[in-house]
Amino acid sequence: VVVIETKAPEQGRLQLSYKGDFSVTMADLTDYNLMNSSEKLQFETLAGVYQDTNHSMANQLRLDDLRNERLKGIARGIDTYWLNEPLRTGFTHRHNIYAEGGEEKIRYGIGLSYGEVQGVMKGSDRQTIGGNIDLIYRTGKFQFSNKLTLDYQKTNDPAVPFSEYAQANPYFKKYNDEGRIDRYLYYYQDPELLETEAISNPLWNAHLNNYDKGDQFGFTNNFIIEWFVAKDLRVRGKFGITHATGTTDTRLSPLHTDFDDLEETEKGLYTHSTTKRTNYEGDLTATYGRVLAEKHMLNAVAGFNFNATKRTANGYKANGFTDDQFGAPSFANGYPEGGKSTYSESQPRAAGFYLNGGYSYDNRYLLDFNYRSDGAS
């Protein structure tokens, strides 16, 4: 066993340290070799996009008019670059401060950290807060140590994926002639078949009251006691507890184009989920090692350990929102058709003990013994 300890601070003095990290992140779009508007229209023409496969004269005239209309727009200079819309320059900063001190028998340390990370996607960010308390106390043949860490994280993610911007055609305009965002880049409904062709505008969905956010909180506490019974015998006990809670909430506005084909009482979607996890673990170990007559080496390790974990998860979905701004689940009409709230729970446990022994004579003849028993539920 190798034990490494950091250099102790000067007795009776408080030592402070600070560390800061700052960075700037930008998206690399060199791998996106997308066609311009003229190239894309030519590609679609060669691919038969503007050819009616059912040999309908009326529909062929419509497709010809559609291609000519897009060709006129290209001639007027329409060549839209969509990839820059959801992107930004991300700034990140992290700070960590740690204070430590102590005397001959006791050492302590207190730390605090804070960080903000901006993603290159607009609406993508992460905030982290952490803390830790370290204590070590020595008296006689005993040493006590305790380490507590706490972590909190808050996240936000964009509701419209980057792929929707990459798939938008360059011959479409981002805004209409009045400078407003249209719901669709292209919309057509067949008057006879009542079939609809629609291409949604990613800027429309992005400006709605959508969100995808979450927060997590957790802590870990480890307590260790060591008893140096004799030069050849040491007993060590450890008990630890870990707890973590996570919550996620996502919401799509009833004005989102995903709900265009649904009834008013089914538009919009709110999703909530919560997870909890608590873990207890401990072990007790006795270690013995001795050399007799410079040739006989004896060593033995005996121990007992246990572990218990409880996990729970619950969640639900709600739909039927009547307004873009009213996003709380209390404004929903109810569960989606066939939907209901969910809940799950599990509690695995395990325990075991072991005995390892060894004998060596003159570093030439070796004898090892190992025994272990485990149980779990």
Per-region residue spans from a language model:
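Periplasmic N-terminal accessory/gating domains of Gram-negative outer-membrane beta-barrel systems
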Residues: 1, 79-90
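A beta-strand signature from Gram-negative outer-membrane beta-barrel systems
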Residues: 1-19, 92-94, 107, 115-118
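Outer-membrane beta-barrel architecture
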Residues: 3, 17, 98-100, 111, ...
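Outer-membrane beta-barrel channels and translocator barrels
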Residues: 9-11, 92, 103-104, 138-142, ...
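Surface-exposed loop/interface segments of Gram-negative outer-membrane beta-barrel transport/assembly proteins
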Residues: 11-76, 119-121, 130-220, 236-351
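Transmembrane beta-strand segments that form the barrel wall of outer-membrane beta-barrel proteins
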Residues: 20, 112-118, 367-375
